[in-house]
Regions:
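Mature catalytic domains of secreted/periplasmic carbohydrate-active enzymes
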Residues: 3-248
Length: 248
């Protein structure tokens, strides 16, 4: 356990970095620092619900190892889709994701690591606006699939469905990320259903336009008392699909 900022070395390091780099963030586990001094970290795990404070989840592309490994029981990779699902879940809960890639002894990455990195980069190139600079919306999630809270809880795959959404917002835009693209291309976002004030709706705003990030075609959409319905047309993806809702 750390002895906190009272430790002379840590205090010197903190202020040296603050001066030389213009900022410093302390991440810690197991309540090593008093709450509020740094960013709490959950190793290979997440919170089940959104938090009002910033936090971090750290995990690896391999299920059984932080380091490069050729052992069959260690070298089991997560799918790019699963990593993006984790990213969306964490960010929607006011968290940040630290993702580890373990290099080989010569310092290079294995071909599988590079393949995953390219896949993640392709997704971020299209959908980064739902991640960078966003904040919490009124709720962070919708759907049947729940996350087990706590450390070392990400070993098993989560079977997200097309009914599972994670939400972020920025300015007048709401981002609804569908965790698994539906085979029929029909999305139903129930948290954005239409309702009058007497029904105490979760959100009572006006939808001006709906876009599907990465889909150049204009999205067809309707809104009623059941949900905001979005038709993807012919657009399909093996990765989470992000709907941008532009509001008035």
């Amino acid at each position: 356990r750390s002895r906190g900022l009272g430790d002379v070395y840590k205090r010197q390091y903190y202020f040296n970095v603050m001066e030389s780099r213009g900022g410093c963030v302390i991440n810690y586990k197991h309540d090593a620092f008093p709450f509020g001094i740094g960013v709490p970290d959950i190793e290979r795990g997440q919170f089940a619900e959104a938090k009002p404070f910033l936090w971090q989840s750290d995990t690896s592309v391999m299920r059984g190892s932080w380091c490069y490994s050729v052992q069959p029981d260690k070298a089991v990779y997560k799918a790019p889709q699963e990593i993006v699902q984790d990213l969306l879940d964490v960010v929607s809960k006011n968290g940040r994701l630290l993702l580890n890639f373990g290099p080989k002894p010569d310092g290079t990455l294995a071909d599988k690591d590079v393949e995953i990195l390219h896949k993640l980069a392709d997704w971020m190139r299209v959908n980064d606006e739902c991640i960078h600079g966003t904040g919490l919306w009124r709720i962070n999630q919708e759907g049947p699939t729940k996350i087990q809270e706590g450390q070392f809880a990400d070993g098993a795959s989560r079977n997200f469905t097309s009914e599972d959404f994670r939400f972020t917002c920025r300015g007048g835009n709401i981002y609804a990320a569908c965790m698994a693209c539906p085979a029929d291309g029909k999305l139903h976002i129930r948290s954005l259903r239409e309702a009058d004030a007497s029904h105490l709706p979760l959100w009572h705003g006006i939808v001006r336009k709906v876009e599907v990030l990465g889909n150049p075609a204009q999205a067809a959409w309707t809104r009623d008392g059941e949900a905001l319905h979005v038709d993807l047309g012919t657009y399909r993806s093996d990765m989470p699909v992000v709907v941008k809702i532009i509001t008035d």
